Structure formats: C-alpha cells, structure tokens
C-alpha cells in the first residue's frame, strides 16, 4: 500500500513498476493506492504486507522513502543504509578542517571513504554521460497523459547554431533536459541528489569537460565534493521534495553543481562553500506540486 505523496506521484515516478518488477518473480503483487492517507513519519510512506493462501496477513513492514534512494522505518529506527562514514556533520566543521589542513573537500572525502570510492564515482560519471547521450538521441512523447514531447534534441540542435555568447547556456539546458527526459521515461540515471533533480549535475559537468577539457580525474574529484555538499543537506535537513519541496531537490542539485564547478575553476574551500550556498538560496521556497504526479511539469516543462 502506497500512502500520501508516494501514492499521489507513484504512477509518474513508476514506483509501482519498480515494486512489481522486484517482487513479482517471488509472488503475485497487488498495489493499493492511498494518496489521501498520510502516515505520521514522512509523506512518502508504504506498507508491504505478506499474505498466505487464505489472504491472511503473516508479516507487514512499513517503510518510508526519504529521498535519494534512502529508506527509514520510523523515529526509533533511522535511515536504513550503510553506517555514516563522515566524522563531521556540518559545513562549518568541514570548512574549518580544510583551512586547518590546507586540503580541499574532495580530500576530506578521500580520507573518510574507502579507496573504491573512485571506481564508484567513475561509474556514476559514465552513467551520467550515457543518460545525456541517450536523451539527446531520443524523440517522441514522454509516458503519461500529458503527451509532453521530448525536446532535448531540438534544443541541442538549436544551441549548436547560437553565437558563442549564448551557446553555452543552450547546450547546458539541452543536456539537463536530456537527462530529465530519460528519468521521466524510466531510463537509467543518477540521483543527484534525487531523480527529480537528476539533470543539473550531469549537464554542468558534461559541458565544463567538453568546453574546458577537464580530465576525468578532476571531474571525479568535483563529484566527490558535490556529493559531500548534498550529504550535508540530507543529514541536517532533507532532499525529499515531498517533505521540503523542490528547494530540497533542484535547489540542492544547484548547490552541488555550483560547488563542483567552483572547485574545477580553482576556488578555495570558502569560495566553494559560498557558491553552493548561493546556488541553494536562490531556490528557497520552491514547492513540489507536479501536474498529474508526473516528473514532467514543472520538473521539465
């Protein structure tokens, strides 16, 4: 049973498809939609009930989707994921660490994470680029009743004909559209920090690499820094649009992209932090109220 915002937007986010694809090989699955019923802990609540042959409930599990792929059960059992790997919980402490050590944010990530973080980030970067490439090639209508047409390829072609002063903006826009349209179609993307805001980071980093010839290693370090900033918001506030509005999704994505871009251009830790702050504050107050529960309007349109 899907409750609240998870039920209201579940069709558009293909939540039911993900659940059925996962559980159907094990046993028959029935989805019950309860968009007007909100569970107490979080707007994105769901209950899994296992029934026997007599339709009697044998086990049930209530869990909440709190953003970026993370799950939580209730106030007594916080986020269900791997243990925290970062000793510091806010940007003030991390910025002070950078100033004391003379190191940057990505080096803090390197010290806290395992060595395979770079292999993981390489996979993330490859997935982001693949989503852009697929989105720029795809045409047609996005799934759902709105009949919204894909526009990334059209905007990309237009941007290539712009004068240099306008071309960068047009290209970044087309890249972001490409990834967002892939997400709306159920394609493979990276939560950055969420599915609804998945186009911002890839668009900015892809354009910077193509236009400025940044190496893959520099991009991976920028991703590490961006992830750190996103994690700070996730830990201290929320990246769930259902809980805090779009400011927690696109706003945080903009902050992450701003931090990454500033680092690529040689910004100091203080400048990187300030860039992220400005990126977030310009999105404060944005709500999450998608038409028909689809990640299309205003998420794309």
Regions flagged by a language model, labelled:
Residues 1, 202-213, 259-266:
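Alpha-helical support elements that line or immediately flank enzyme active sites
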Residues 2, 12, 42-44, 50, ...:
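Non-transmembrane, aqueous-exposed alpha-helical and coiled segments at domain scale
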Residues 2-7, 19, 35-37, 223-232, ...:
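Acidic, glycine-rich active-site loops and adjacent beta-strand->loop/helix elements
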Residues 18, 35-37, 54, 192, ...:
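N-terminal loops that bind phosphate or other acidic moieties
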Residues 20-22, 28-162, 170-171:
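C-terminal regulatory domains involved in ligand/effector binding and gene-expression control
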Residues 129-245:
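Accessory "access/gating" subregions that flank catalytic or transport cores
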Residues 233-301:
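Hydrophobic alpha-helical bundle architecture
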């Amino acid at each position: 049973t899907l409750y609240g915002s998870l039920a209201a937007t579940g069709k558009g986010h293909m939540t039911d498809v993900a659940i059925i694809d996962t559980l159907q090989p094990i046993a028959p699955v029935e989805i019950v939609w309860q968009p007007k019923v909100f569970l107490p802990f979080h707007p994105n609540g769901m209950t899994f009930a296992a029934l026997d042959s007599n339709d009697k409930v044998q086990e049930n599990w209530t869990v909440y989707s709190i953003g970026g792929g993370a799950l939580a059960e209730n106030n007594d059992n916080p986020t269900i994921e791997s243990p925290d790997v970062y000793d510091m919980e806010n940007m003030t402490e991390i910025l002070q660490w950078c100033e004391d050590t003379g190191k940057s944010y990505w080096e803090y990530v390197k010290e806290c994470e395992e060595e395979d973080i770079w292999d993981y980030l390489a996979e993330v970067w490859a997935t982001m680029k693949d989503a852009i490439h697929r989105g720029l090639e795809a045409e047609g209508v996005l799934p759902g009743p709105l009949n919204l047409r894909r526009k990334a390829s059209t905007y990309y072609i237009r941007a290539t004909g712009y004068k240099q002063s306008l071309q960068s903006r047009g290209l970044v826009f087309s890249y972001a559209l490409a990834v967002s349209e892939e997400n709306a179609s159920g394609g493979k993307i990276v939560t950055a920090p969420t599915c609804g805001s998945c186009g911002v980071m890839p668009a900015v980093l892809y354009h910077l690499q193509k236009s400025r010839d940044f190496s893959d290693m520099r991009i991976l370090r920028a991703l590490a820094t961006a992830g750190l900033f996103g994690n700070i918001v996730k830990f201290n506030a929320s990246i769930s649009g259902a809980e805090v509005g779009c400011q927690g999704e696109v706003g945080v994505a903009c902050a992450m992209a701003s931090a990454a871009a500033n680092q690529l251009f040689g910004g100091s830790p203080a400048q990187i932090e300030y860039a992220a702050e400005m990126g977030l504050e310009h999105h404060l107050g944005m709500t999450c109220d998608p038409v028909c529960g689809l990640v299309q309007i205003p998420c794309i349109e």
